[in-house]
């Protein structure tokens, strides 16, 4: 499951994000995006046709997962427990992305680990390609293989 920020960094040519996306594609790893990620990416008001095409090209290497009732209810559960158990306000888009990752048993690739780290106790696996860039390859593959 790829978070919005990784795609934004990929489009900007940021090395760690570009590397992570290339690794996912080259190693034929199943890639998922939530429809909320698609909405966030296309909601920038000044996107050119070329930028829209690049976004679509990145999204086309994976599968877009719709927000259905299961995802919505899991997201609601995550938001409630985030507030109740951790006194954290989990934004709805983040809750949807996390819920989708959990329901798919997928690793969430994000730079915003801080927003999600409390959900590790509830089974969410996170990978930040910006951490320890020098040994990314080994850590990335082992993290994905654990699931």
Please provide the spans of the model-predicted regions.
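Acidic, PIN/NYN-like endoribonuclease modules and their adjacent C-terminal/linker elements
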Residues: 98, 102-147
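Alpha-helix capping/helix-boundary segments
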Residues: 6-7, 37, 71, 96-97, ...
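Donor nucleotide-sugar recognition loop
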Residues: 86-93
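Short, well-structured N-terminal submotif of metal-dependent ribonuclease cores
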Residues: 1-33, 43-56, 135, 143-147
């Amino acid at each position: 499951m790829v978070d919005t920020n990784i795609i934004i960094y990929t489009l900007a040519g940021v090395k760690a994000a570009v590397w992570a996306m290339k690794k996912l594609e080259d190693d034929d790893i199943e890639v998922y995006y939530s429809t909320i990620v698609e909405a966030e990416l296309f909601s920038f008001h000044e996107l050119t046709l070329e930028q829209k095409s690049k976004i679509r090209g990145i999204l086309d290497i994976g599968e877009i997962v719709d927000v259905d009732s299961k995802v919505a209810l899991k997201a609601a559960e995550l938001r409630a427990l985030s507030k109740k158990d951790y006194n954290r306000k989990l934004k709805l888009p983040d809750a949807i992305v996390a819920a989708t990752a959990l329901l798919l048993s997928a690793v969430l690739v994000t730079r915003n680990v801080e927003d999600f780290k409390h959900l590790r106790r509830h089974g969410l696996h996170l990978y930040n390609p910006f951490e320890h860039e020098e040994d990314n390859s080994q850590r990335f593959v082992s993290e994905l293989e654990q699931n």
